[in-house]
Amino acid sequence: MAKAVHSMVRVLNENRSIDFYKKAFGLEVADRLDFGDFLLIYLRNAETPFEVELTVNHAQKVPYTLGDGYGHLAVTVEGVDAEHARMEGEGLAPGALRDFKHDGKTLARFFFIADPDGYKIEVIERGGRFV
């Protein structure tokens, strides 16, 4: 059986991205591998072994084109309202809180936030199918 271990995003500014993921999700640098032309930085927290891999290509000087195929990464939290307020307090500009409904039933409460390079992250209230 396959096990998801990380999701990689290409970033322009190492420090700006590390700061965002630490403030937003409590992710810390677990490993940093410098290959000369590029750098891999693995971020994680105590909640899960799943990591966000930041790739810094040193020759890249302009923002990446994100395209229209990629959607988002999703994380769950215990209290989505409190997390939304905390992120606002950190100056991270989370999007509006929304309810995800199907057949008149609320399946989840969530919001989106974008990292410094524009990658969207969905923050979902933990519960139901989103544990």
List PLM regions with ranges:
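Exposed loop/turn and edge beta-strand positions of beta-sandwich/beta-sheet ligand-binding modules
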Residues: D37, G69, L107
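N-terminal beta-strand motif that seeds the catalytic metal site of vicinal oxygen chelate
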Residues: M1-I18, Y70-V75, I124-V131
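Core segments of cupin and vicinal oxygen chelate
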Residues: A2, M8-E51
